[in-house]
Amino acid sequence: MRLSQFHLHTTKETPADAELVSHRLMLRAGMIRKLASGLYTWSPLGLRVLRKVEAIVREEMNRAGAVEVLFPTIQPRELWDATGRWEKFGGQLLKIKDRKEQEFCYSPTAEEAAAEFARQEINSYKQLPLNFYQIQTKFRDEIRPRFGVMRAREFLMKDAYSFHLTDEDMAREYDNMRAAYTRIFTRLGLDFRAVQADSGAIGGDASQEFHVIADSGEDSLAFSTGSDYAANVETASAAPPAPRAAASEAMQQVATPTQKTCEDVAQLLGIALQRTVKSVAVMTQAGFVLVLVRGDHAVNEIKLAKVPGLADYRLANESEIREHLGCEPGFLGPVNTARPVRVVADRDVAALADFVVGANVSGAHLVGVNWGRDLPEPETVADVRNVVEGERAADGGELRLARGIEVGHVFQLGSQYAQALQATVIDEGGKAAVMKMGCYGIGISRIVAAAIEQNHDDAGIIWPAPMAPWQVVVCVINPKQDPQVLAAAQALLDQLLAAGLDAALDDRGLRPGAMFADMELLGIPHRVVVSERGLAAGTFEYRARTADAAESLDKAALFSRLGH
């Protein structure tokens, strides 16, 4: 391919609203152009990258035994009413009417369509298991589309839906898909982690996310140095605490007139922050609850909501706090409460001895507090906190925290969607059985942006080789002035293509500096320059995208450097 015959339009200017590096570089490289808020046209260059990602995803899904289908993007309201998601999905669901006033939605995901297809097509357990996947445009009506294709309203997604007779078979396919996803992201050349996750609005029992590691990631991840353990901070856990030590201090009240935070109290008393206890007051349908975490820890809202009776909790207001504890916020504690309250203690708090809590008296705290002596053992002990960088993991390693961009998610859905849409089969006993479902998504267009967030420098994109628009670009100096140089460059291009390399010829006639800057901006892994001087010496100028300088190589050395 000659770039003079290819639409390539790079720019130096970046719109002011392009916040992320990937958004800026994709615009500057001419990969995308904005059509409307959250809607982007993919240029020929951008589409080359997108199709390369799509091809690897398709190959690995086929290898894993899934079969490709294509569901409609426009889906009838009846299906979404059956599962309750017509209302539950909220404002992100784009709802439309046809000329007959019948209601439809623009599919943000396709569990309903897949379950309906399975109901129509599968009637016997002998046909199971089956895994259908599609690569299809989706639409979610984001309130504030931002970050380019990272959070666009319209995006390209691979979504798969598997159907099973038993939970055990569903779990086997879940593992099969996790392995396929690992192969996909490995082949794409990305630094990623598969993490335990919360199932969120889609639901289900087991859930795992795949994140590309990047400083700009919206999600906070924790992973261990001792194994492949990794989890979203929503679900991550550290090693359990050591057994509680024996009490060694007497409880006494101390004045803390202006110290309302654990940090200030610890500094005043000259003690470690880990010995203080933070009291968080919440309200549930059942009443007032006091949640306790160590002063150096933070409550994890997702974990707390999973504690029995706290699914609907909210923070208590000041009047509710005064009613139950008899004091103002800043001095709260579980000792001497005005009314009986339920106490939920993080397991690290339950393991403390001689700790410090608010005295439920304005301007005072209690020191030397101990469970079983100064207050009852906590009614509920659970892991309800965020993990901390460097603490011990359950496998003995250290926990490390990183930011991640979610690019894939796998779920074990169970029977909720199949039950709602009456997707049943005849089982071995001749009875109707509701099928079990798994669902598995990959954000194909999001992968492109995530790869750039992870791989770039001041000059531009640094593509992992499998994703680059071309592996090699042959650059010609003064192609119009020297036909021999152009002919030699074309001959080299033909040899590169014959060797199986995805290569292009830059014959646009740009100044060398501008041409080389474009190649760096576009993230081309290998740049080869053909010039009159080089031909006279029998060499080519070669530079890898990440190299500090160019080098002169003869043809044999060049092909060796390119892995051929």
UniProtKB/Swiss-Prot annotation:
Catalytic class of the enzyme: ligase
Gene Ontology MF terms in the entry: aminoacyl-tRNA deacylase activity; ATP binding; proline-tRNA ligase activity
Any one Gene Ontology BP term: prolyl-tRNA aminoacylation
CDD domains in the cross-refs: ProRS-INS (cd04334), ProRS_core_prok (cd00779)
Primary subcellular site in the record, as a coarse category: cytoplasm
Subunit structure: Homodimer.
Function description: Catalyzes the attachment of proline to tRNA(Pro) in a two-step reaction: proline is first activated by ATP to form Pro-AMP and then transferred to the acceptor end of tRNA(Pro). As ProRS can inadvertently accommodate and process non-cognate amino acids such as alanine and cysteine, to avoid such errors it has two additional distinct editing activities against alanine. One activity is designated as 'pretransfer' editing and involves the tRNA(Pro)-independent hydrolysis of activated Ala-AMP.
PANTHER family listed in its UniProt record: MITOCHONDRIAL RIBOSOME PROTEIN L39/PROLYL-TRNA LIGASE FAMILY MEMBER, PROLINE--TRNA LIGASE
Protein name per the record: Proline--tRNA ligase
Organism, as annotated: Xanthomonas euvesicatoria pv. vesicatoria (strain 85-10)
Gene name linked to the record: proS
